[in-house]
Amino acid sequence: MVMAKNLTKFYVVFLVVLMMVVSLLLAIEGRPVKDSSRSLTQMRDSSMFNGSVIMSSFKPVESSVKDLSWLATVKQSGPSPGVGHHRAKGYKMFGRANDSGPSPGVGH
């Protein structure tokens, strides 16, 4: 009976440690959020997060609208979404097989 209590305590401690390790790995796995060209760690060390925000460092609204470098954080990798070659080109053929038959295979 004493061994069963020790074994239960071992499993509880093991599960708690495992959950802590998994949560730590999940927390450090993600990529840092980028603000223009600076990463989140650089932003955290900046004067904005230390409480000493300098008003002259703010950009005017016009330059913020023209500066579209923040769009680089939206898509960093992976396949491109495609421009228009997957759109339905002929609505008359929609719902029918255009060229039926077996596909020629990869690269043909």
UniProtKB/Swiss-Prot annotation:
Q: Tell whether Secreted is among the UniProt keywords.
A: yes
What processes in GO biological process is this protein linked to?
A: innate immune response; nitrate import; regulation of root development
Region described as Disordered: spans on this chain: 76-108
Record PTM Hydroxyproline, positions in chain: P102, P104
Q: Which residues are glycosylated?
A: N50, N98
Any one GO molecular-function label of the UniProt entry: hormone activity
* UniProt superkingdom: Eukaryota
Q: Per the record's keyword annotation, is RNA-binding included, yes or no?
A: no
Q: How is it modified after translation?
A: The mature small signaling peptide is generated by proteolytic processing of the longer precursor.
Q: In the record, which residues are listed under signal peptide?
A: 1-27
* Chain residues in the propeptide: 28-92
Enumerate the UniProt keywords alphabetically: Apoplast, Developmental protein, Glycoprotein, Hormone, Hydroxylation, Secreted, Signal
InterPro entries tied to this protein: PIP2/PIPL1 (IPR044700)
| Gene Ontology CC annotations of this record | apoplast
Q: Which family does it belong to?
A: Belongs to the C-terminally encoded plant signaling peptide (CEP) family.
Main role? Extracellular signaling peptide that may regulate primary root growth rate and systemic nitrogen (N)-demand signaling.
* Subunit comment: Interacts with CEP receptors (e.g. CEPR1 and CEPR2).
Record's protein name: Precursor of CEP16
